[in-house]
Amino acid sequence: LLERKKLTSGTTWHAAGLIGQLRANLNMTRLAKYSADLYTKLEAETGVATGMRQSGSLTVALTDSRKQEILRQASMARAFGVEVNEITNKELKEKYPLLSVEDVKAAVHLPKDGQCDPANIAMALAKGARQNGVKIFEDVKVTGLDTHNGRVSSVHWESNGETGMISTEIVANCAGMWARELGNSVGVTVPLHACEHFYIL
């Protein structure tokens, strides 16, 4: 794993750490379920405190189209073993008394959703990876990829004025806001783009 700076030095340290499993498509639902299940075991496996709390989540719909959307998402989540319950407005009010429910057309409750400490989750994942033989190199920037016959063949890197190349047949592009640019360099479209967000102290 090549990390251009230090692990968690990007936006990870101030992320909300929300663990939600209600997603818009099949693959994202499967990934969210896998991640939530993994995060509940990480602390025991690595000894790194993750702050994982399964406090549950509520999703509400105020329009008919949103109602159909969350009910479809709930059905898909259920098919993958995610615990999700459609609840009445009365049950919604009991779970969250501050919420005005008069205009709510549908609500779902996911009791295994929750929150974690994103920086510590990343460190626990890194420790678990190292325990399983992964080598992590910090302060190493990926500068390019080579391909041969339509497949990746090597990764070029730069670190503190030194450069190098790693021969490989597989690359996982985890470059965050630079993933699109890195993919484009070898003709791969990565459907990501950077967007502004806010953090209030």
Model-assigned labels for residue ranges:
Residues 12, 49-53, 191-193:
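Short beta-strand
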